[in-house]
Amino acid sequence: MSILNPRTSLEAGDSEDACCAAMASVCCINTKEDADSPSAGLPSGTTQNLDVEEIQGYDVEFDPPLESKYECPICLMALREAVQTPCGHRFCKACILKSLRNAGHKCPVDNEILMEKQLFPDNFAKREILSLRVKCPNLGCTDTMELRHLEHHLVQCQFASVECSQCQGSFLKLLLDKHMEHECGRRRTFCDNCGLAMAYEDKSGHELICPMAYVTCDYCQTNLIREQMPAHYSMDCTMAPIPCMYCEFGCREKMQRHNLAGHLQDFTQAHMRMMAQTLRSFSTTPTSHISDISFCDPNQFEPVPLSVAPAHPSHMPSQQDCSQETRNLRETVEQLEGRLVRQDHQIRELIAKMETQCTYVNELKHTIHSLEDKVADMDAHRCNGVFIWRIKGFSGLQKSQEEEKPVVIHSPGFYTGDPGYKLCLRLHLQLPSAQRCANYISLFVHTMQGDYDSLLPWPLQGTIRLSILDQSESTARQDQVEVMDTKPDLLAFQRPTAPRNPKGFGYVTFMHLNTLKQRQYVKNDTLLVRCSVNIHLDLTSPRREGFQPRSGEGTL
């Protein structure tokens, strides 16, 4: 009876026969069922050597809650590696072994004499416990599974805390990849200038010293890589302050490099006097102080500062030595004066060439501007009444509008045909403080003086279609469109008497700025405005007057 119903025999625990029957039933259980235990595959000797005293019951949340018959009386948790005593009580293997070794050989429940060799594994209870469903202990995870599958789930659970291998921080597994690729301060990155690999948090510091990074000259605002900047300061920068080349003779002037030539030209006589004064000081200087000066190469001449004091008469060299030194100094001065004259001529020639080049550059700029105007005029003639206005840098215009700065821009002129009327568009971003039209895009059409005004009938009559284009990739684009007919009695459509008619015609509330966010009206920071004009050449045809219907897309 106890073999067929082992649960009853285990729960009773009142008679020695019942305990023996439970032991017999457990021993008959298939070894495949024992494999549910983490230590089932280990040899018996290995299992005995494990530090089982440190392993208590399963501290997990069961769903439904754990029945009391599966609780260990010692650790009050679910039985782990359940064993049964001859007196019919169940314990975790580690718990009862620790109790027997620390508290003596007795059962903790009824104080019956109990030896370690009397314990036997309760595989039936073990299998029952491993079949119970438990909740994942990781915060945020709602999965439940059998206890035997919990360890495998914890390995794969996306809500488990794992350590970042780069910064050693703790993160949820599902967020680890994003952290390591985009957020980790120690993630690997490369300098945009020199290509050096480094941690992301070190990049900003590296940019301050990167030899290949572009920096701006403090004087001329030229952009150069950092390693070129010292040579630029000392050799090329026309705005860098430099001392006069005669500073060693006593000139204390400092000027920008491009002003050096003018300074040398204006102070030639002063420089000569400084040189003469310096040379006179040599005549009263001991030979030992000037013996190091080589008079063979004037390019290497290094004058002694003016602060050198005259020597005591007792140390004066002989008259013959002074005469020879004076002759050498005079030769040096003559050579330097010759060099100065040649350099003065070279400077004058360079100034003349520079003026010629400046004139030539100005002529080229004028030619370029003329060509640009011609190209723009050709484009205006070629549009044939359909004009697309590309407004670049639209985010900057919106920022100015948000700062209560007026934003009014005009498009280039365009023709309705060849010959045709010349028109332009005006876009106005209404300020947030504007009454009745705050934060709206206003769009108007203006007539302009064109090449064919004398050949065309006035006032202008036709239909004008204004659109702000949806730049999304989908086929179901939703352009913001308004259509209006011209009104001949308005000044906006009369022949203009100024380059651009100050009177325009259009919509004050063409489109709300918030509508731009609903579709991709702005792409690559560019807004596209399309104007299509259909001219009515038959002056006797009836014209549509009165209220002009508006598209429903422009309303909020």
UniProtKB/Swiss-Prot annotation:
PROSITE patterns in UniProt: MATH, ZF_RING_1, ZF_RING_2, ZF_TRAF
Catalyzed chemical reaction(s): S-ubiquitinyl-[E2 ubiquitin-conjugating enzyme]-L-cysteine + [acceptor protein]-L-lysine = [E2 ubiquitin-conjugating enzyme]-L-cysteine + N(6)-ubiquitinyl-[acceptor protein]-L-lysine
Main localization of the protein described in the UniProt heading: cytoplasm
Tissue specificity: Highly expressed in ovary and moderately expressed in kidney, spleen, stomach, colon and testis.
SUPFAM superfamilies assigned to the protein according to its UniProt record, in alphabetical order: RING/U-box, TRAF domain-like
Disulphide bonds in the chain: none
Gene Ontology MF terms in the entry: signaling adaptor activity; tumor necrosis factor receptor binding; ubiquitin protein ligase activity; ubiquitin-protein transferase activity; zinc ion binding
Gene Ontology cellular-component terms listed: cell cortex; cytoplasm; cytoplasmic side of plasma membrane; glutamatergic synapse; lipid droplet; nucleus
Domain comment quoted from the record: The MATH/TRAF domain binds to receptor cytoplasmic domains.
Protein's name in the database: TNF receptor-associated factor 6-A
Species for this entry: Xenopus laevis
Gene name of the record: traf6-a
